[in-house]
Amino acid sequence: MNVGRYQIQETLGTGANSRVVRAYDPMIDRGVAIKLFSPEIARGEARAKFLREARVVGKLSHPAIVTLHDMGIEESTMTPYLVMELVEGQPLERIIAKGSVPFSTACAWAAHVANALAAAHHNAVIHGDVKPANILITTDNRVKLTDFGMSRLTSHQGVDSSLFGTPAYWCPEQIHGRAQDARSDVFSLGVVLYEMLTGISPFAGDSLQAVCNNILSSSPQRPSHVNSSIPALLDDIVTACLCKDPQRRMPTAETMAEQLFPFARRKPALASAAIVEPNQRSRVSRLLRSA
């Protein structure tokens, strides 16, 4: 089976409205990943929306963002598709299903994702669906953020009450049906970081309503209370990311990366003493005093 000039080889994954396949591009002589969407997206207003959002993704260029090579609609089957960089590795979702990861590793991975988000935010793009399934860890331990399919140009975003994405990673403003911005991605990445550090979800519930209620009103245990190897200052960073009020949340993904990278450079035994620089401590303290 072919899609355009691309030769389909195997299915890599399947979602609710799409599937990802491994393919070969004979023109460039390289492997690629192709995301195939439902034909419904190729009709009417949805077609224009698909093409518009694909162009949004195509604007992004960052080492930790999966590169978009091509896009189109296979007219014979009316199948929209995105041709992307083929990443050899596994989703973070599969890794944390086995439990927590060392906090220096968790901080490194989260910091790289935060830098990728910062690059997107500087281009007026929010991801809108940051979760472990959309974070790939390569075979050489690099991080790749994928699936900007839910992203929006912030310059065009108004109040939208529709709930897309995965409930466990929703931010409070999304549940309330309010406009989202870059701080919404920070909250979702904070949830991912919490899961990496502790091996559990901060807002777990036995129903959609319970999850939403927990996101809106409960305060999860501090990570160090779940995993004693985690230093207290890292607790503070996670708390700042998960602040329910966007005005008091960790202000930018760039700031989040700056706060996390020092932990990533230290071994666990040294990390609690690593973040003692006055300017670093004062930045976190200011965030927490306002939370």
Language-model features: where?
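Activation-segment/catalytic-loop signature of the eukaryotic protein kinase fold
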Residues: 71
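Protein kinase catalytic-loop region centered on the HRD/HxD motif
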Residues: 115-125
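Activation segment signature within eukaryotic-like protein kinase domains
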Residues: 109-110
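Conserved short submotifs of the Hanks-type protein kinase catalytic core
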Residues: 76-91
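AlphaC helix of the eukaryotic protein kinase fold
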Residues: 38-59
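C-terminal lobe helix-coil module of Hanks-type protein kinase domains
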Residues: 168-269
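Protein kinase glycine-rich loop
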Residues: 9-15, 20
